[in-house]
């Protein structure tokens, strides 16, 4: 019998970055446990961690490429697959030009070094403006507000949960999400610690979520009105002279404009809009201002709504007004060991962030951070004319489940001339592909959370080497992406990928040696490249990024600093300390100051103000739809693993008892939910955890499409809530509106199923 060995690695399935101890017997995964010695998670783990074993054993996980022949996806060699890509992609590019090909990058890409480090070369080789990602059905409003205020899209202040005394949470459920735009394992333990040290946790949410149940208090709020509430809190702080930004006042522009914008949003003006009494709003404001250390934190419920950017902006306005921005126990800027733009070069001045540099062809929606709103992808495919999308590349994404008006996108994708997907499953989206290129399983890939450490409450660095060898003939994921780039660049399926990898690292080195303030400023690029040795691929890039990062050894400048070699010798990670104040150096705005009221955001305030006098969604008696997170799900990509779908049906319509009685709904019965975009039927769950007038359906389900090859997911199909989502967007960011959707709800008398979209 083979000897058992234990491998330590970071879990790649959510933002918490928990350390795991994976016991192997040869190629068999024996067990997955929490790593008690991990410097960040200290043994904490959640059920998703078991996905490492179950994904390894999943017979539906693709291990060989698929090519469409005679209408069917069949196994092919890697050479045949790339030849098919070269022919199909080349044809679309040749006939329609660069913008005829669109790219969609899904959420799992953020957890994998291949897409994180090599996605940019692919996008540059394609040269298309039709770039889409899960960001515009998720966090884009926060990136836009942070970028415009502080100068970089990932300069997102995160709550210093380990040192705060008062945490106000809106539209977030970190006990289930494990923290989002907030990397901090064991959020339950961290929130409990706030209360144990005499602090307070306040949750504002249309659902009494698991986090709300652990909080000191919970307030229901009408979906989509968070910005009204936040403005009212700002109004109280200013009117009662409770605002005290402290040292940050000398680093900020337009404080007077913020006061002017907040003036109409009195507690009395907004109480009917948001459903929270004026006296309660005043108390929330006074307690926030009175706490020794306080932070405001908001997440997906506030970003996937009509006023997502305004709500995201106002969170940081409140942190500023209360003197808690960039302060211990407040909301602070993380300092990552690698790949963080706001820690490279010299602050506080920089180029800042521009949005709307180009517009989508059909609806004229503006670009954000180099991509277009995915809510417009269907119309870009379906609408004839110059620049019509005729080809699609998807990487680790399932947009036919994850994006709004999914029915329209499903119809549009069927008309494409060519589609290629990098994915481990034939799912609702990839079943339409002409070529599917499987990525290796997580245990066969190196791992470093280059993206998520930029949002972590402590500066942590943890490298995970591959546990398993790649199957014979299987390329690395980064090699697959580079070969797609070479094909897009016209070099064909047999291009020299090693040369592409060299180009990537040489570009990074060249940029860094020319960067004022870099530890290798002015050094010889050849010397730096030689110092990286024989490493290739992500290992070489991460080694380089860590060495030139804020804790790095700087290629000899600080012999005690970090390198990949040091990380390899530290299997439980290296803790580099808590967050620290970083203003003004963290700023990258052209002014070198905090822009408290960016014009792009201030211009959207009249739209919000108009709702003070109007009726607003949900104020006329109609039902309003919201989503919900689930601990054993991560969007649409964990549902083929038995351990994560076992138990009772989780894809239900949650409804308040008063509404259930009025609508004639029964526990365990079926409800038909319809919107302007579509209709579905799902099981009813009656609970007083939901606000009256609101219904909730989790996202990421609906796995009953013909052609899917995910047997477990199909047996627990659920319904796709995005059939109900319109193509409406938050104006400044282009983010989809997935919460606060007006719907009609009625009893149904048929089995739970997704019904064809009506739009």
Located regions from the model:
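N-terminal export/assembly segments and adjacent metallocofactor-ligating motifs
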Residues: 1-240, 254, 269, 277, ...
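Acidic/polar loop patches that form or flank catalytic/metal-binding clefts of enzymes
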Residues: 30, 131, 244-245, 281, ...
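Extended redox/cofactor-interaction regions of prokaryotic respiratory oxidoreductases
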Residues: 116-192, 199-204, 228-231, 317-431, ...
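Flexible glycine/proline-enriched surface loops and loop-helix/loop-strand junctions
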Residues: 172-173, 214-215, 264-268, 297-302, ...
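Active-site phosphate/pyrophosphate-binding segments
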Residues: 233, 251-374
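Catalytic, metal-anchored helix/loop core of enzyme active sites in primary metabolism
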Residues: 434
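Glycine/threonine-rich phosphate-binding loop and adjacent beta-strand/alpha-helix elements that clamp
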Residues: 443-470, 480-485, 490
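Long, contiguous, secondary-structure-rich segments that constitute the structural scaffold
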Residues: 467-554, 636-654, 658-759
């Amino acid at each position: 019998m083979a000897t058992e060995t234990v491998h330590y690695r970071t879990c790649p399935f959510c933002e918490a970055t928990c350390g795991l101890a994976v016991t192997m017997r040869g190629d068999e995964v024996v067990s997955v446990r929490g790593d008690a010695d991990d410097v960040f998670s200290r043994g904490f783990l959640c059920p998703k961690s078991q996905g490492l074993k179950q994904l390894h054993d999943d017979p539906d996980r693709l291990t060989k490429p698929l090519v469409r022949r005679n209408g069917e996806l069949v196994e092919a060699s890697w050479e045949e697959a790339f030849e098919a890509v070269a022919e199909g992609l080349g044809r679309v590019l040749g006939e329609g030009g660069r913008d005829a090909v669109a790219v969609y990058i899904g959420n799992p890409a953020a957890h994998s070094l291949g897409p994180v480090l090599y996605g940019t070369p692919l996008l540059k080789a394609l040269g298309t403006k039709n770039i889409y990602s899960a960001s515009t059905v998720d966090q884009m409003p926060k990136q836009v507000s942070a970028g415009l205020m502080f100068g970089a899209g990932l300069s997102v202040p995160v709550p210093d949960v380990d040192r705060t005394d008062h945490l106000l949470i809106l539209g977030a459920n970190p006990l289930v999400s494990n923290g989002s735009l907030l990397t901090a394992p064991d959020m339950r333990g961290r929130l409990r610690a706030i209360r144990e040290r005499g602090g307070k946790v306040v949750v504002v949410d249309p659902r009494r979520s698991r986090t709300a149940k652990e909080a000191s208090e919970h307030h229901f709020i009408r979906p989509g009105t968070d910005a009204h509430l936040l403005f009212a809190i700002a109004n109280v702080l200013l009117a009662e002279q409770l605002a005290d930004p402290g040292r940050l006042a000398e680093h900020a522009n337009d404080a007077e404009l913020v006061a002017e914008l907040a003036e109409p949003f009195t507690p009395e003006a907004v109480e009917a809009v948001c459903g929270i009494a004026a006296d309660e709003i005043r108390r929330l404001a006074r307690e926030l201002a009175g706490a020794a250390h306080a932070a405001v934190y908001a997440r997906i419920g506030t970003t996937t709504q009509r006023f997502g950017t305004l709500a995201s902006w106002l969170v940081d306005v409140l942190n500023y007004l209360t003197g808690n921005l960039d302060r211990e126990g407040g909301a602070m800027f993380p300092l990552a060991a690698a790949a963080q733009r706001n820690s490279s070069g010299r602050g506080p001045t920089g180029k800042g962030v521009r949005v709307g540099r180009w517009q989508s062809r059909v609806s004229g929606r503006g670009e954000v951070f180099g991509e277009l709103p995915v809510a417009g992808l269907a119309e870009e495919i379906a609408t004839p004319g110059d620049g019509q999308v005729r080809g699609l590349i998807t990487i680790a994404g399932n947009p036919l489940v994850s994006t709004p008006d999914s029915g329209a996108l499903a119809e549009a994708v069927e008309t494409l001339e060519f589609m290629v997907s990098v994915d481990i499953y034939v799912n609702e989206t990839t079943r339409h592909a002409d070529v599917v290129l499987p990525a290796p399983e997580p245990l066969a890939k190196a791992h470093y959370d280059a993206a998520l450490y930029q949002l972590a409450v402590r500066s942590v660095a943890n490298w995970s080497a591959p546990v398993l060898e790649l199957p014979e003939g299987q390329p690395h994921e980064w090699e697959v992406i580079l070969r797609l780039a070479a094909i897009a660049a016209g070099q064909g399926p047999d291009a020299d990928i090693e040369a592409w990898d060299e180009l990537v690292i040489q570009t990074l080195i060249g940029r860094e040696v020319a960067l004022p303030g870099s530890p290798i400023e002015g050094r010889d690029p050849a010397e730096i490249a030689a110092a990286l040795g024989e490493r290739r691929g992500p290992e070489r890039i991460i080694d380089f990024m860590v060495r030139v990062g804020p804790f790095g050894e700087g290629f000899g400048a600080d012999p005690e600093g970090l390198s990949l070699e040091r990380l390899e010798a530290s299997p439980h990670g290296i803790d580099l300390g808590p967050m620290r104040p970083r203003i003004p150096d963290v700023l990258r705005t052209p002014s070198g100051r905090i822009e408290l009221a960016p014009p792009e955001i201030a211009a959207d305030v009249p739209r919000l103000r108009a709702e003070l006098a109007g009726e607003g969604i949900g104020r006329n008696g109609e039902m309003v739809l919201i989503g919900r997170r689930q601990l054993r799900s991560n969007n649409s990509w964990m549902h083929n693993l038995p351990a994560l779908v076992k138990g009772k049906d989780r894809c239900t319509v949650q409804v308040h008892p008063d509404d259930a009685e009025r609508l004639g709904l029964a526990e365990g019965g079926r409800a038909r939910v319809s919107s302007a975009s579509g209709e579905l039927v799902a099981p009813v769950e009656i609970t007083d955890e939901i606000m009256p007038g609101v219904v909730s359906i989790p996202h990421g389900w609906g796995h009953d499409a013909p052609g899917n090859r995910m047997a477990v997911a199909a047996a627990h199909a659920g319904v796709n809530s995005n059939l109900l989502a319109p193509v409406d967007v938050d104006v400044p960011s282009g983010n989809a509106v997935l919460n606060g959707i007006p719907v009609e709800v009625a009893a149904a008398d048929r089995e739970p199923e997704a019904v064809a979209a009506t739009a």
